[in-house]
Regions:
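A short beta-loop-alpha structural element at the N-terminal edge
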Residues: 67-94, 233
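Conserved GNAT acetyl-CoA-binding A-motif
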Residues: 202-214
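Acyl-donor-binding surface of acyltransferase catalytic domains
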Residues: 35, 41-66, 238-241
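Conserved acetyl-CoA-binding loop-helix of GNAT-fold acetyltransferases
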Residues: 158-161, 173, 178-181, 187-204, ...
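Conserved beta-strand-loop-alpha-helix junction that forms the acyl-donor binding cleft
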Residues: 182-186, 212-222, 238-242
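Active-site rim helix/loop that mediates acceptor-substrate recognition in acyltransferases
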Residues: 97-136, 165
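Gly/Pro/Ser/Thr-rich low-complexity, intrinsically disordered segments predominantly at protein N-termini
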Residues: 1-42
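Conserved active-site alpha-helix within GNAT-family acetyltransferase domains
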Residues: 35, 41-43, 192, 204, ...
Length: 245
């Protein structure tokens, strides 16, 4: 998540109108020379899920209506369309046209498949399809980060090439890199169903936790994380004492 896909915006207006503008936490707002100037300022938080906890089945989309399937790089084109629709009103992609969002989606997904977000774990990445329509309605992609203190900013990127056998050895730290849902199928537990599907192979490989990242201002993502049992990772600079778990 970065400002790569967030355009700087300049809109001429009266200062009184500027004061009444709604704010988005992903942008910095300034009034300069008779115009509102919005500059990208995305900030992210990290959260962690204890994989020993069971995800309640009642929170998950019905297995009668939706089918989980493996996710493959050959699904990239369909995934890009789904991605673009899912993030239509969400930063850092909300300021793009539909064509630009599809392009951004394709680039982001290829980065993940190619390991730029850490080694991609195909065995823990899934699709969800509507049984009645056969339509793709959700996807989750998991990668592996360095095994480190999640409060340390360096824990979220590989400074050196990661070993190729991390997954086979149950090493590295799983990270929920992308999860997205069709706009017409939100609110029925699709994301939670995908999360439950991902948790199973992670547990089987001996992983105890799953990290995730969300952008400040994406309230629906934040609430989804809390509803599914994620806990906020404290900042390494925080002076608050850490809770012992």
């Amino acid at each position: 998540m970065c400002d790569e896909w967030m355009p700087k915006v300049r809109v001429p207006m009266a200062s009184e109108s500027f004061q009444r503008l709604p704010r988005n936490a992903a942008y910095n707002y300034e009034y300069l020379e008779g115009a509102a100037v919005l500059s990208p300022r995305p900030r992210t938080y990290h959260a962690i899920l204890d994989l020993t906890r069971t995800i309640p089945s009642e929170l998950q989309a019905s297995a009668v209506d939706y089918e989980v399937a493996p996710l493959m790089p050959t699904d990239a084109e369909a995934l890009a369309q789904l991605f673009a629709g899912a993030f239509e009103r969400t930063q850092p992609f909300a300021g793009l046209t539909i064509e630009e969002r599809i392009e951004a989606a394709a680039v982001c997904l290829q980065r993940t498949f190619q390991g730029h977000d850490g080694p991609w774990v195909a065995e823990a990445s899934f699709l969800l399809r509507s049984r009645s329509e056969g339509k793709l309605v959700g996807a989750i992609l998991v990668t592996l980060l360095p095994q480190s203190d999640p409060a340390d900013i360096s824990a979220y990127e590989w400074l050196d090439a990661p070993p190729s056998d991390l997954w086979m050895k149950g090493q590295g730290q799983p990270h929920l890199t992308w999860i997205f849902t069709h706009a017409w199928h939100k609110g029925v537990g699709i994301g939670t169903r995908l999360l439950a599907a991902t948790a199973t192979p992670l547990r089987e490989h001996g992983y105890a936790s799953l990290l995730s990242t969300f952008i400040v201002g994406n309230d629906s993502s934040q609430l989804w994380h809390w509803r599914n049992g994620f806990e906020l990772v404290p900042s390494i600079t925080s002076k608050r004492p850490r809770l012992k778990t």
